[in-house]
């Protein structure tokens, strides 16, 4: 069986022309049958995609040929099945949303620590270790003795810092996240707030799991990932968690045995939080998902609106590509 290559990538770089990159990038991904989502902003590129090895290699070559997008930080893992349903390239204000203006990792950032040096750093009693990820990610796995800020989104992280960290008291701060991108901004933010010794795990948790042997590892549990695998274990293979299609929270097989769990409708995490109207909508969505699956029109997890959206985006990408080729021909004639 041919393995699907999953590629997580990002790069902070000044991209004043980022809007013009979207159409050719989307067209390239669709032609190579790459699925997943990439975000473009004036500060760079970020996302996770999947495809055949040849397709992912072609994407990296294409990106490397674009002005400013060479030498992109990327990490590869493998899966037996395609972990994404659609192909998207989105234009954003930030490639990772902290919501604080003026934070620029290109100007100031924390000290990068290689995975093989990470254990020694976080074993230092003078170092406070902070997990910059969201609470639902931390719950299924984190580093030994790491502090959980209990945030629901990355936007809440600056407030956590203001309320809980002090440059005069916390002399050494080490931080980590899934692939490294959130720490680019979190360490830049701490440096701007006057913290002196600020460190972050280069390549994030995924790089650590790839390079550090399990018997030497200080990682505990699994690592949440933003695709249909939900989580990966220390071997970077799909873990034991599933995901509630209603609230998107990771759930265990034990939780799926709960009366609160209804496929696509509710789980123990959200049963008391969703309204009757939401429940009706989720039931209908699940019905449409099953109908689409029976017609072989979409994978599980897609509803009719998403199928329509995917079709429209593909047609729009084809239209833009055709228009660009036509304009190029006219320019040659002139």
From Swiss-Prot:
<comment type="function">
    <text>Catalyzes oxygen-dependent 5-hydroxyuridine (ho5U) modification at position 34 in tRNAs.</text>
</comment>
<feature type="active site" description="Cysteine persulfide intermediate">
    <location>
        <position position="177"/>
    </location>
</feature>
<keyword id="KW-0560">Oxidoreductase</keyword>
<dbReference type="InterPro" id="IPR036873">
    <property type="entry name" value="Rhodanese-like_dom_sf"/>
</dbReference>
<protein>
    <recommendedName>
        <fullName>tRNA uridine(34) hydroxylase</fullName>
        <ecNumber>1.14.-.-</ecNumber>
    </recommendedName>
</protein>
<dbReference type="GO" id="GO:0006400">
    <property type="term" value="P:tRNA modification"/>
</dbReference>
<dbReference type="InterPro" id="IPR001763">
    <property type="entry name" value="Rhodanese-like_dom"/>
</dbReference>
<dbReference type="InterPro" id="IPR020936">
    <property type="entry name" value="TrhO"/>
</dbReference>
<dbReference type="Pfam" id="PF17773">
    <property type="entry name" value="UPF0176_N"/>
</dbReference>
<comment type="similarity">
    <text>Belongs to the TrhO family.</text>
</comment>
<dbReference type="GO" id="GO:0016705">
    <property type="term" value="F:oxidoreductase activity, acting on paired donors, with incorporation or reduction of molecular oxygen"/>
</dbReference>
<keyword id="KW-0819">tRNA processing</keyword>
<dbReference type="Pfam" id="PF00581">
    <property type="entry name" value="Rhodanese"/>
</dbReference>
<feature type="domain" description="Rhodanese">
    <location>
        <begin position="123"/>
        <end position="217"/>
    </location>
</feature>
<dbReference type="InterPro" id="IPR040503">
    <property type="entry name" value="TRHO_N"/>
</dbReference>
């Amino acid at each position: 069986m041919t393995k699907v290559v999953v590629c997580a990538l990002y790069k902070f770089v000044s991209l004043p022309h980022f809007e013009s990159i979207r159409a050719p990038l989307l067209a390239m991904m669709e032609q190579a049958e790459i699925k997943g989502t990439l975000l473009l902003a004036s500060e760079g590129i970020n996302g996770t995609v999947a495809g055949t090895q040849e397709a992912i290699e072609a994407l990296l070559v294409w990106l490397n040929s674009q002005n400013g997008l060479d030498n992109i930080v990327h990490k590869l893992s493998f899966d037996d099945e395609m972990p994404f349903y659609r192909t998207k390239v989105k234009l954003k204000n930030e490639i990772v949303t902290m919501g604080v203006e003026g934070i620029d990792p290109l100007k100031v950032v924390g000290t990068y620590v290689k995975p093989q040096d990470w254990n020694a750093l976080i074993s230092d009693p003078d170092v406070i270790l902070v997990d910059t990820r969201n609470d639902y990610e931390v719950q299924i796995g984190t580093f030994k003795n790491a502090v959980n800020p209990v945030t629901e989104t990355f936007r809440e992280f600056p407030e956590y810092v203001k309320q809980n960290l002090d440059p005069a008291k916390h002399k050494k701060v080490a931080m980590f996240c899934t692939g490294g991108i959130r720490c680019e901004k979190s360490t830049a933010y701490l440096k701007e707030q006057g913290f002196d010794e600020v460190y972050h795990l280069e390549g994030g948790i995924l790089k650590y799991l790839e390079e550090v042997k399990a018997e030497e590892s200080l990682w505990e549990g699994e690592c949440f990932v933003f695709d249909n695998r939900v989580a990966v274990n220390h071997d970077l293979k799909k873990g034991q968690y599933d995901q509630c299609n209603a609230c998107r929270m990771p759930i265990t097989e034990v939780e799926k045995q709960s009366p609160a769990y209804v496929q696509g409708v509710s789980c123990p995490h959200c049963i008391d939080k969703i309204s009757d109207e939401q429940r009706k909508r989720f039931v209908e969505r699940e019905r449409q998902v099953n109908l689409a699956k029976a017609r072989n029109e979409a994978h599980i997890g897609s509803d009719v609106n998403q199928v329509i959206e995917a079709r429209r985006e593909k047609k729009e990408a084809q239209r833009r590509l055709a228009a660009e080729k036509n304009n190029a021909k006219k320019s040659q004639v002139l």
